[in-house]
Amino acid sequence: METIISDATRRNWDKLSVNIDNKLKSRANKQKSTKRIIPVEYLLDNDKIELIKQIIEFHSESRIQDVIYHVAKELLQNENIQERQSVREILLDFQAEHHVKRLQFKGCIPKFSCEEDFLGTLYQALLSEGEKNRRGSYYTPFEIVDDMLSGFDLGDSLNFLDPCCGSGAFLMRIQTSNPLNLHGIEDDSIAAFIAKVNLVLAYKDFEFTPNIICANFLHDGSFFERPKQFDYIATNPPWGNKSKVVSDLIDSKESFVHFFVKSYNLLRDGGKVNFLFPESILNVKSHKIIREFIISNHDLDEIHRYSSSFTGVVTNFISMHFNKAVYSPNVKVLEKDEEFYVDYSAFEYTKNKVFALLRPREEEIIKRILNKSVYSLSNSQWALGIVTGNNKEKLHTSNGPLLEKIYTGKEIEKFTLKDAKNYIFYDRDSFQQVAKDDIYRAEEKLVYKFVSNKLIFAYDNSSSLFLNSANILIPNIPGMSTKTVLAFLNSNLYQFLYEKLFGELKVLKGNLSELPFPRIDSKIDNELTLMVDEILYGGKNRQKEIDEIIYKVFEIDNPLIVE
């Protein structure tokens, strides 16, 4: 069980004499969930949802492979193709591999429809959430599949690959006059069987053996005679799986990155590839290497940001469409009902090569800010709040001897701190993690919420302590007081800047360090400092006036776009 925690976490727990087994059992761990969920978006009507529920209930003690085999056989019999040689081989191979047992099968199986995936839906419903999470195998709704395949035209001779095809959604939905031009790879033998069955049903007028290989696309070597042999590739690769692949192509621990890069190299020049990715590929630091790969090839031509979701997946997701080796000067972005174009230069604004999807007016504002800026927070002092290791034991709700107040992120508001609700005995040696004392005891410092999609900074000149839900900044910007820096960070313009450049749900030191600051004269510095004092000590609201000054500093005459 201990393998699911990091070495750093284990060291911290050892230091605090934590019972690791009890701690792990108390953690919410989706990978161990035994819950079953039916992905209803894959079916057309409620009758089939009820039928799947009945099958699961009646065959709750049966093995998954036995249930899938018998339902597949019923589907094939419904179309009168079960006696074809190629179909018999598919059934016999699966029967032999899984030692399929006969079932007293209950359930009236519907006729096959290319508009839904009954067999794949049943399989997903039979798998526990924990198993799907470990595999990263959540199948893609046809609505999204169809959108990703739009513009793919195989005709009679062009070929298509799905390198992690699951039950075959992309293979079923792409249009071709020759099913032998369709290729899929899937390492789950049950899913690969379903994909084969779905294809022979979808192309029941053809006598053929589907080109579905049951193997691991990343680990099992080369499946094809030569590189650059495919015209089209599209898929939804596993997300969240850490890859153990050692590749000469790219250095990454994310499996979806390896799926993409290996697929890209199997695509011919001029071929098209469309991948479904977690939205985090746009901005998270750990995905910088794949963004650099994409930028270097300069053939990404479309990003589609989806507002929908599908069963089992809470992560926001996007699709990226590439036209290999065809230079693209900009990238079309589709977002809800909006369409706009982003220049590749927008991907170079940050050190981590964040894909900032800026509309033209937004990019104009960003460029103006960058052109006026000469400083950053990179030379400032930073610290984390205290990690006690046991808040229940070490935090007190009332004051007492040797105790002092300690603030949490919940008490941080723009500019000011609410009253502290907790007290602590400041014994540095007893804490799991603690910063230098002179940081906490600084004459003045800024504190900010760490888990937030908003920049919320407060001023502290009371040398107070803070828990780790708050982080600490002692800024060093030439010509600016600490309070003036506070004014900039709490402004609408800097909120806009942070959102557009980084798009994070957390306020990270690395991102804050890159925020650009202008050179200002002493008059503006004094003016902003005075306004912050009026907020801190006079109870006045000076946000509007602060915003107006900062807009003027950057010569932005129409701030409505950032509000």
What are the residue ranges of the model-derived segments?
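Conserved hydrophobic/aromatic pocket- or pore-lining residues that grip, position, or stack substrates
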Residues: L122, M148, A195, Y448, ...
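Polybasic, glycine- and aromatic-enriched phosphate-binding surface used to engage nucleic acids
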Residues: M1, L267, E364-I524
